[in-house]
UniProtKB/Swiss-Prot annotation:
Biological or metabolic pathway of the protein: Cofactor biosynthesis; riboflavin biosynthesis; riboflavin from 2-hydroxy-3-oxobutyl phosphate and 5-amino-6-(D-ribitylamino)uracil: step 2/2
Name under which the protein is recorded: Riboflavin synthase
One of the GO BP terms on file: riboflavin biosynthetic process
SUPFAM superfamilies: Lumazine synthase (SSF52121)
Primary gene name: ribC
Pfam families, per database record: DMRL_synthase
InterPro entries membership: LS/RS (IPR002180), LS/RS_sf (IPR036467), Ribfl_synth_arc (IPR006399)
Family the UniProt entry places it in: Belongs to the DMRL synthase family.
Keyword annotations: Magnesium, Riboflavin biosynthesis, Transferase
Signal peptide: none
Amino acid sequence: MIKVGICDTTFARYDMGGAAIDELKKHTAGIKIIRRTVPGIKDLPVACKKLIEEEGCEMVMALGMPGPEEKDKVCAHEASTGLIQAQLMTNTHILEVFVHEDEEDDPEELKVLADNRAREHAQNLIMMLFKPDRLTREAGMGLREGKPDAGPL
């Protein structure tokens, strides 16, 4: 059975991990989902690495919602760097799914964005694991997660 890791934070203002799990359950069968929740985004890299090394996850989603302040953007960058290092150390994909609080002014629009981005990245995970040729066909299509696609040039 394929194991997939979901790692999210208590700092986030929306349950992106729950949305990703819901999407995975709707569109896959025979996978085991292991969820871990950490306080903030800087905790994601080690938690994701542990899901891979200790739980045997074949792919992991790291979901977080950095705040709007400059220090939050710095923390998001550091977390992103840590996630890249964890991927290289484990030779395993970790899909970074961040929604910055200042991407939308309206809380309802932020909620929709967070839900859509989590679900669309869950679809990416499914394609990477089970339908990699589909991603190849979509190369250069300007696809976006959470917002409208930009389209090809």
